[in-house]
């Protein structure tokens, strides 16, 4: 098959440029997916932004020989090179948090863009390794196996030579799986009910008895008119997960339509909270190319040091993004928890999660229904009796 396939791990951008991406593309994309996808979804904002940046930068290099030479010899165009270094810093942070991420971009090998994509990818990977003092950027057998099992089969289904040779068609595929390394210690496991959203088309519209992990720890919480939230830090990289529970009369869609305001709310001071999180895993396998139709991708890069007015159209954009909510260690199963007078935050209904740090969003998900996503367990009481 005549094409150029680039495998890369997601990297970083500077504060100003990142905020532009987050607002102009990522949040618009999330709203579009939320609008047309009633089921659960998991979206690696990090991977998608990196794919768009690589294509944009490659198009800029294609039209500027001096910029291309600068990237090759590492001299001149300091702002562009610094932008690449900033992507590397963000990748290092995600890598430290043990994100499993991989992307591929494919265009016809006959096109000049193929060589430019390869160059941009090589510079990005070199920049990532400059920040990688622990050497965990280097390819590993585990990552190769993960790429093979999760991405190559999907790519083969829709990347065909006849398509790639038909003009400048671009195909992208993005894979991500994250199992959060919670900083908080979970003490026990208990079976509780999760109230599914009846409008999502899943088989079960009744509450599902699911295993939940329980932690009594000190957390930061937040509150808006639409949601109440709790921030659960990860054990590395200064990342964490913000869980947003919609208030009565508010939906997850309402939260996602106003996500920028939700995630920028100041947190309350730390306090002891009984946290109950469902134990489950979810995968979002979808072609998201159509969701970019109403988004001006080029406007996103107006502040980039890589200058290009070329249109970006990705003909196929397949994502395979997943999340696993699970304890780090095996927990003792208990029948009940004495919460006393301490505040309880129980994630027992549809919710939104955001993996983030103080500046950047790394992943966003909406969980409407847990039917079939957890181990089958029995609750001690019928839901109607509670």
UniProtKB/Swiss-Prot annotation:
Glycosylation sites: 24, 378
Entry's localization field: Secreted
SUPFAM superfamilies (alphabetical): Serpins (SSF56574)
GO process annotations (BP): sexual reproduction
Position of the signal peptide: 1-22
Pfam family, one: Serpin
Tissue expression as described in the entry: Main cells of accessory gland and seminal fluid.
Result for mutant: residue 338 to N: In strain: Canton-S and ZIM34C
Effect of residue 359 to V: In strain: Canton-S, ZIM12C and ZIM16C
One term under GO cellular component: extracellular space
Site (Reactive bond): 339-340
Entry keyword set: Behavior, Glycoprotein, Protease inhibitor, Secreted, Serine protease inhibitor, Signal
Protein function: Responsible for physiological and behavioral changes in mated female flies. May play a role in accessory protein regulation and/or in the coagulation of seminal fluid to form a mating plug.
Family per record: Belongs to the serpin family.
Annotated protein name in UniProt: Accessory gland protein Acp76A
Organism this protein belongs to: Drosophila melanogaster (Fruit fly)
Lineage, opening ranks: Eukaryota, Metazoa, Ecdysozoa, Arthropoda, Hexapoda
